[in-house]
Amino acid sequence: MDKLTIQASPPLAGDVIISGAKNAALPILMAGVLAETDFVVSNVPNLRDVTTSCKLLRCLGAEVTELGDGQIRISTTNLNEFCAPYDLVKTMRASILILGPLLARYGTADVSLPGGCAIGARPVNLHLHGLEMMGAKIEVKEGYIKARVDGRLKGAHIFMDMVSVGATENLLMAAALADGETVIENAAREPEVIDLANCLIAMGAKITGVGSATLRIQGVERLQGCNYRVMPDRIETGSFLVAAAVTRGRIRCLKADPASLESVIAKLEDAGAKITTGEDWIELDMQGKRPKAVNIKTAPYPGFPTDMQAQFCVLNALAQGTATITETIFENRFMHVPELIRMGATMELEGNTCIIQGIESLSGAQVMATDLRASASLVIAGLVADGKTIVDRIYHLDRGYEHIENKFQGLGAQVVRTQ
C-alpha cells in the first residue's frame, strides 16, 4: 500500500496549477446519463473517485472515452443496465448521485447504499424523500435502494429539512427531466451545485435561482449533450494556501477560482497572510511570519467549508495563540486530531469543538490517514514537523488530490511516494 514520506521542508515557494473540482466533476459525470447525445466534460481531475464514476457509467452500458488532457466523452446510446452494484458504490458515496438521473430518464434505478469517507452518518433519506414527492416508488431492501416511476417524474415543491449538497444535486438532476415545475427550498448553495446547474442549463435544462437557497426547475422532455468545463477545486486550492501559510512561504495558485473561497481567504488574512487575487489566481505571502491563531466554525456555503477544517487544525497547532474549531456539518470529523497529538500538537476535544494551543514546532511520526481531508492535514503537518513523517493509507488522499506529491515537490517540499 502506498505511503508518503515527508521531510521538514523550507517555506513553500512558486506556482501550483489547480485541478478541476472533484466535488463538481462527480455529479457532472453522472449528469451525462440525462443526455441523449454525446456529452464531453473537460478539466476532469485524474482521481480514484473519477475512475470509479467512469467504471459505474460503463457498468450501466454507457460508452465512456477518456480523450486525454482531462477530457471525458460519455455516450448513453447503449445504456441498458439500471443497477449500481455494491462493489462500486461501497468505495464512493457520490455513487448515490446516479439515482436521480437514472430514475428521471429511464424510470428505474437500483443503487446500493453508499460508502466513502467514514465521517459520520450522512443519511440518504433527503434524496429518497424528495424523489418520492416527485412520484417515485422507493423501497430499501437487501442493501439496495430500489426506485421506480411510471412515466415521468412529476414536478413538486420540496423543502429540504437540512442543507444537503448531494440531495440538492440528485433532485436537481431528476427535476430537469420531470413533468412540470419543481421548487427546491433550503437548497445547498455550494459552488459545485452552481457548476452542476450551469452544466444542466448548457444541456437544455430550465433552471432559475442558481446560487440561491430556492431553485426552480421547469422540466423538459429531453436534454442534449454539450461540452462543459469543470470548475477549479476550491478545497485543493485552500489546502495549498494553508500549506504555504504554515511553512511561512509564498505561493501562487493558478487556474483557481478566488470567488469560491472567500471565507477561507478571510481566515487566512486573519492569520496574517497577505493575499492578492486575480480573475483566476490567488497569491499568498506570509512574509516569513508565523501564522496567528484563528477561530473557525464550519457552516454550509457561503460559510466556512467543513472540507477545510482539518487543514486549519494544523495551522492553529503551529500558530501564535489559542483557537477553537467547531464542526457543525458532520459528527466524527476530528479523526485527524489524535494523529496530530502524536506529532506533538496541543489539542483537546470537547464535543464538536477542538481547542488548540499553538506551539512552535511538531515532531515527525508515522501517522495514518482516516479520511480524505484528514490525510491532507497530516501531509501539511509533515512539511513543518522536525524529522521524518510517514503518512499511511494515502488511498484516501488519492480520492481527492491529483498528483499531490508532484505539486508539493514543485513548491520545494520534500514529499516522496513509496510502496
UniProtKB/Swiss-Prot annotation:
GO terms for cellular component: cytoplasm. The keyword ATP-binding does not apply. It catalyses: phosphoenolpyruvate + UDP-N-acetyl-alpha-D-glucosamine = UDP-N-acetyl-3-O-(1-carboxyvinyl)-alpha-D-glucosamine + phosphate. Pathway: Cell wall biogenesis; peptidoglycan biosynthesis. It is an enzyme of class 2 (transferase). Its main location: cytoplasm. Disulfide bonds: none annotated. Phosphoenolpyruvate binds at K22, N23. GO terms for biological process: cell division; cell wall organization; peptidoglycan biosynthetic process; regulation of cell shape; UDP-N-acetylgalactosamine biosynthetic process. It is found in: Cytoplasm. CDD domains: UdpNAET (cd01555). One of its GO terms (molecular function) is UDP-N-acetylglucosamine 1-carboxyvinyltransferase activity. The active site is at C117. InterPro entries: Enolpyruvate_Tfrase_dom, Enolpyruvate_Tfrase_sf, MurA_subfamily, RNA3'P_cycl/enolpyr_Trfase_a/b, UDP_GlcNAc_COvinyl_MurA. Its EC number is 2.5.1.7. The modification 2-(S-cysteinyl)pyruvic acid O-phosphothioketal is found at C117. UDP-N-acetyl-alpha-D-glucosamine binds at R93, D307, I329. Keywords: Cell cycle, Cell division, Cell shape, Cell wall biogenesis/degradation, Cytoplasm, Peptidoglycan synthesis, Pyruvate, Transferase. Cell wall formation. Adds enolpyruvyl to UDP-N-acetylglucosamine. Belongs to the EPSP synthase family. MurA subfamily. This is UDP-N-acetylglucosamine 1-carboxyvinyltransferase.
